[in-house]
């Protein structure tokens, strides 16, 4: 049995998703250990052994992590949040030097995708149509923007739609700049053109092995109609009817129709190939006039990893089988097509313990 450690399994992030996917793999393949900074982690009952780790920004984090891996005999290490992804990336040689399989993408690609403006620029240079965008650091730089509505978001960092806003005209954009403290509280942010309609939105996974060989791709056509999946929904007052009656930003919690969607995944595979992906890659996009319009790329396992595993496309398991078990995992293996919906799950934690019991 392969001993794996999944970090940051609490909080409903992609660590939780990786854990769920590994639990869906063939029985007897894994001994799964879990870690989180929160000792009262609801997922603690789902792993063979749970350990509490410091936050990734703690200077002792790496030492504690490596000591934990040695004590548990960990063979494969999965990150569960983006601060850990960046730390694992920066310390790849140390972790791999300890004999631990680290299924993360290429260092240069991770660094590129953490900067949204640089990602957009690279896509444009490679010939893929990206929405208009600009990084701004002062209010005077807003004056040249004439492609409303726009999405205002942090220029660096990861997904989850955190701190993302919609501005429908210059007045709203200037008000947002004041609200966000442009030039004072924040040094800058990215402004990106809002494109397409909510029913054209996809989250797409393109998997390559760590040697850069293409494995498979899958898409979730998002259902952006519930409070769980929607961060922002406002009436469209721009007069641009092609954008639909409402302007909608996803919360990052994806649910919907899952399948091949070849018209979408083929274009996303071309993007991943061109970027030189070596590992998991997740592309957030809208499909407009026959073209994929990318608004974000996350070079990691997705918040839909367990959904993909439910239909037979288990990315964490595939990478372990390919690189640790030396199995032939093929290419474009078939998987089920389905609609997968999500809901909240309550967990009862007995006082004095961190063993979770789903209600």
Language-model features: locations:
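Preference for protein termini
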Residues: 1-35, 70-73, 210-212, 226, ...
């Amino acid at each position: 049995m392969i001993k794996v450690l999944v970090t940051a399994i609490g909080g409903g992030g992609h660590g939780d998703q990786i854990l769920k996917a590994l639990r869906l793999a063939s029985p007897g393949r894994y001994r799964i250990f879990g870690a989180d900074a929160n000792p009262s982690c609801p997922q603690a009952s789902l792993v063979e052994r749970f350990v509490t780790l410091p936050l990734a920004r703690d200077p002792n984090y790496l030492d504690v992590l490596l000591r934990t891996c040695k004590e548990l005999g960990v063979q494969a290490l999965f990150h569960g949040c983006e601060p850990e992804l960046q730390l694992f990336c920066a310390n790849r040689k140390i972790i791999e030097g300890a004999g631990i399989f680290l299924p993360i993408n290429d260092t240069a690609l991770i660094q590129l995708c953490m900067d949204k403006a640089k990602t957009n620029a690279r896509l444009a240079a490679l010939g893929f149509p990206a929405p208009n965008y600009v990084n701004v650091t002062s209010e005077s730089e807003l004056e040249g923007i004439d492609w409303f509505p726009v999405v205002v978001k942090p220029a660096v960092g990861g997904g989850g739609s955190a701190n993302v806003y919609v501005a429908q005209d210059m007045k709203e954009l200037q008000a947002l700049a004041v609200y966000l403290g442009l030039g004072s509280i924040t040094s800058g942010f990215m402004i990106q053109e809002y494109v397409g309609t909510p029913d054209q939105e996809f989250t797409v996974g393109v998997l390559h092995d760590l040697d850069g060989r293409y494995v498979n791709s899958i898409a979730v056509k998002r259902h952006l109609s519930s409070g769980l999946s929607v961060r922002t929904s406002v009436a469209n007052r721009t007069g641009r009817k092609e954008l639909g009656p409402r302007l909608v930003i996803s919360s990052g919690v994806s649910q919907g129709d899952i399948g091949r969607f070849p018209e979408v995944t083929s274009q996303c595979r071309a993007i991943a190939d061109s970027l030189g992906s070596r590992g998991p890659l997740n592309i957030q996009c809208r499909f407009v006039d026959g073209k994929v319009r990318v608004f974000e790329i996350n070079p990691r396992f997705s918040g839909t990893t367990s959904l993909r595993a439910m239909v037979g496309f288990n990315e964490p398991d595939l990478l372990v089988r390919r690189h640790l078990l030396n199995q032939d995992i093929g290419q474009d293996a078939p998987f089920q097509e389905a609609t997968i919906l999500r809901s909240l799950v309550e967990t009862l934690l007995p006082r004095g313990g961190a063993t979770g019991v789903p209600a």
